[in-house]
From Swiss-Prot:
This is 3'(2'),5'-bisphosphate nucleotidase CysQ. Converts adenosine-3',5'-bisphosphate (PAP) to AMP. Its EC number is 3.1.3.7. GO terms for biological process: 3'-phosphoadenosine 5'-phosphosulfate metabolic process; phosphatidylinositol phosphate biosynthetic process; sulfate assimilation.
Amino acid sequence: MLDQVCQLARNAGDAIMQVYDGAKPMDVVSKADNSPVTAADIAAHTVIMDGLRTLTPDIPVLSEEDPPGWEVRQHWQRYWLVDPLDGTKEFIKRNGEFTVNIALIDHGKPILGVVYAPVMNVMYSAAEGKAWKEECGVRKQIQVRDARPPLVVISRSHADAELKEYLQQLGEHQTTSIGSSLKFCLVAEGQAQLYPRFGPTNIWDTAAGHAVAAAAGAHVHDWQGKPLDYTPRESFLNPGFRVSIY
């Protein structure tokens, strides 16, 4: 099933690129929480929803662009968790650092994940405890890698005082910044060793990247040391967390 989901992410990426390249208007509007949404978000959402309903008609889907109410999903044990375009701010800035995120959740755990970066044409995927990166048609297994001093990857668009204080206390390290779920993927492929997050994220922002990072050997825990959990709950918000090889 992983190959079909990867192809679905690629198809969604193609729909996004039609807007990114100017073939279709971007049509940026603000949602109720003031976050931006574009025609590309909606186009990718439609591609993924149609594809997953065909691939697995019995598994419900939770997408950022059309999340079902709590009464609908409160008893879900297995479901798809989708962000059709993660990094909309990066998309609008046209820096290429946005992704398509698709994860399969089973009893609160992301057991399959796909993160596709359309501009870079790079696909990260994970299933059955293994993670891969596909680039230029070549797919290879990836895993975390230690480095001293560690490289800490941080958000391109979301900095905060807590993060600044944490980095000051961390000891010797280097930092790099990148948008979207690519932060998880940098840790997964051994380029970075730590991704700390204090600011707000939603479950669709993290599930696919979580699957990839965990399958590559990283720990994805909240600041109390518990793994991020995707068991249905009324709020879509995650607690703060860290993705770490340590």
